[in-house]
Design a protein with these regions (language model features):
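Acceptor/aglycone-binding surface of glycosyltransferases and processive sugar-polymer synthases
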Residues: 63-81, 86, 98-155
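Cell-envelope/extracellular polymer assembly enzymes that use nucleotide-activated donors
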Residues: 8-10
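Acidic helix N-cap motif at the loop->helix transition within catalytic regions
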Residues: 20-23, 46-54
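A conserved acidic beta->alpha catalytic loop
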Residues: 41-49, 94
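Short beta-strand/loop segment that forms part of the nucleotide-sugar
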Residues: 26, 34-43, 60
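Short, structured coil segments at secondary-structure junctions
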Residues: 33, 55-56
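Short, well-formed alpha-helical segments that are part of the catalytic scaffolds
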Residues: 17-31
Length: 155
């Protein structure tokens, strides 16, 4: 059982060609906050799959590259079919801090159906985390477009 809640919390690591950061990611994750962690390698061309097998994760390699969205859908479906109450997406490239799940504890206890976070609320990841400018810029443009289109607050 995880140390956050009596709900089953599974992590799903989404990976493509990330062998050079997997060990750092593993060391960064507080393993006790999850009941289970799946690692989904999206048919990487490097040794990501082999590196991930060295850790206490359930490692799955796609036979074809599904793209980020397809890999994520497969991972979430697998986790829920395996009994997860909540699933946390973890990017293998370390661009998101997986330990921020502690911030969601109260929402988990209140049985929220969806909990989402933003890395843009209190900081600028382009400056503070070395996010590529094009990625940062496109995220901001799409968020602003979605805010206008749906009349909702996004960061």
């Amino acid at each position: 059982m995880n140390k956050i809640s009596n709900k089953k919390i599974y992590g799903v690591v989404i990976c493509y060609n990330s062998e050079h950061v997997i060990k750092d990611l593993y060391n960064r994750i507080d393993q006790e906050m999850f009941d289970k962690i799946y690692f989904f390698d999206d048919n990487s061309r490097d040794n990501s799959f082999e590196v991930a097998k060295g850790f206490d994760w359930h490692v799955i390699k796609n036979q074809t590259n599904l793209g980020h969205g397809g890999n994520l859908k497969k991972a979430i479906k697998t986790a829920f079919l395996d009994g997860a109450d909540y699933v946390l997406e973890i990017h293998a490239d370390n661009q998101y801090n997986p330990n921020l799940i502690y911030e969601a504890k109260n929402f988990i206890e209140q049985d929220y159906a969806l909990i989402t976070g933003s890395r843009f609320v209190n900081k600028n990841p382009y400056i503070e985390e070395g996010m590529p400018f094009l990625r940062y810029f496109s995220n901001k443009v799409m968020s602003n477009f979605t805010k206008k289109l749906l009349s909702i607050q996004l960061t």
